[in-house]
């Protein structure tokens, strides 16, 4: 299979941050326990020992995975598997979904090593609504703001996947702007900082649109694959370009 070939030839990049990632090529891997424990475990899997040789930059718990009773404990780790081979990526996703439905399933010859990897994982998925919106705390902040003033217009940041091409940056920002406007909002400013691979839009939405997203995050705007994160404005990198980039 393409999946076997890709892993056997090590045509997979594994990294702990999403810097420089093309969203079409990434699978988000959430580990049960820390990255260090995962790396130590996969070192013992024949054929995948190399996966345990990733440079561990052990990240302290952030608000996404914070355990109040044990603040020093790393509850979950997150890795990004980058594959240029789309067939291999789809095969891995499909294999994981089958395993989730039937953990005792029989793996085809050559794929049993993935069963061993899967036992250390909590989730494998494409970058989705969960990553874009639900883990940044924006929904809770919107709810608090609307509880205080039910009619307020609220600003937020949409951080886009960084594209090196200026034409792709314009196209990406234009599409997100269109979705914001269709939801009744508008773009206030845009910031592109090449040095840190950052592209962000400062936007605002009316209360009605925010309530719709709180009730059902799977809106066209939140599902937009051009967006990496939706964040509260306090977390935004400050820039000085207009929405048109002037």
Language model features: what each stretch is:
Residues 166-168, 211:
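Residue-level signal for secondary-structure boundary sites
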Residues 38, 168-177:
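Well-ordered, non-membrane alpha-helical segments in soluble/globular domains
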Residues 17-33, 145-166:
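Short glycine-/aliphatic-rich beta-strand segments at the starts of folded cytosolic domains
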Residues 1-16, 27, 46-154, 174-245:
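Autoinhibitory propeptides
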Residues 35-43:
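Calcium-regulated, polybasic anionic-phospholipid
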